[in-house]
Amino acid sequence: MPCADPVAGILAEILKLYTRRARRLAVRACEASGYDVSAALVDASGETLAFAKGDHSTVHTKDTSFRKAYTVATLGPIFKFETLGAFVEKMRGNPNANAFASLPNILLLAGSVSVMANGESVAAIGVGGAPGGEKDEACAAAGLAKIKDRLPH
């Protein structure tokens, strides 16, 4: 049985550390603007890697942040979008939007960004709880911006 590539394993762990930091930074960015949010980090297949809940965020923000991240991670590579806001805009007026919205864990509300490494989506950060998806997405983008230069290009 062949051994797993140890370098790839180390790089994967480093990537997880950086993206977990970005998730925490997204919550802090929203808190600095006075928003109580939660942030979810999922891998490319939509599995939860980490979750951060702001001190005063409400319980529903756990689900919305996950669903936003899940939507970007699982549909972004197929439909070529890196932010959920871009996909929501693309779906506006599309007769298929209701079909997408009925899929489990899909949420057509802005608030998530894709984490790109070596030109491919490797994770997504979703934020929920600010008064408007565009504000959630700005916080997710702010968290990602803090670590983006450290990710493999």
Predicted feature locations:
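Flexible, solvent-exposed loop/hinge segments and secondary-structure transition points
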Residues: 2-153
